[in-house]
């Protein structure tokens, strides 16, 4: 039986989130055993924020949730790919469809931002 290896990175594994239809990589985040278990049980993506040191469900603030369609692990069982149906226009907190909108071009990083929502409106605090 395959067991996910959370030991290599201090209890965390990278999770590559991919659109289940197009194959586009939407985001990469980290999971621990608890968030992987929640994701597999709920069918929604859950992550561990290293910055905020807390658990969070994708879309809990924005409403842009992700419905899990398929979960795969790599040959070392230390990374997962989660294929999702993206509910709402964007996966990235910047309002972009994908977090990967900055491209290396002509020796520099070039932003190809096309926000689908205004993060200042969606993530109002207070």
UniProtKB/Swiss-Prot annotation:
Q: Which Gene3D superfamilies match?
A: Phosphoribosyl-AMP cyclohydrolase
- Cofactor, free-text remark: Binds 1 Mg(2+) ion per subunit.
Q: Which organism is it from?
A: Geotalea daltonii (strain DSM 22248 / JCM 15807 / FRC-32) (Geobacter daltonii)
Q: Name the major location.
A: cytoplasm
Q: Which positions are annotated as binding Mg(2+)?
A: 74, 76, 78
Q: Which gene encodes it?
A: hisI
* GO CC annotation, single: cytoplasm
Q: Keywords of this protein's UniProt record, alphabetized?
A: Amino-acid biosynthesis, Cytoplasm, Histidine biosynthesis, Hydrolase, Magnesium, Metal-binding, Zinc
Q: Which residues bind Zn(2+)?
A: 75, 92, 99
The cofactor(s) it depends on are: Mg(2+); Zn(2+)
Q: Where in the cell is it found?
A: Cytoplasm
Briefly state the protein's biological role: Catalyzes the hydrolysis of the adenine ring of phosphoribosyl-AMP.
* EC number(s) from the headed UniProt entry: 3.5.4.19
Keyword Zinc set for record: yes
Please state what the protein is called.
Answer: Phosphoribosyl-AMP cyclohydrolase
Enumerate the catalysed reactions: 1-(5-phospho-beta-D-ribosyl)-5'-AMP + H2O = 1-(5-phospho-beta-D-ribosyl)-5-[(5-phospho-beta-D-ribosylamino)methylideneamino]imidazole-4-carboxamide
- What binding partners and quaternary form does the record give? Homodimer.
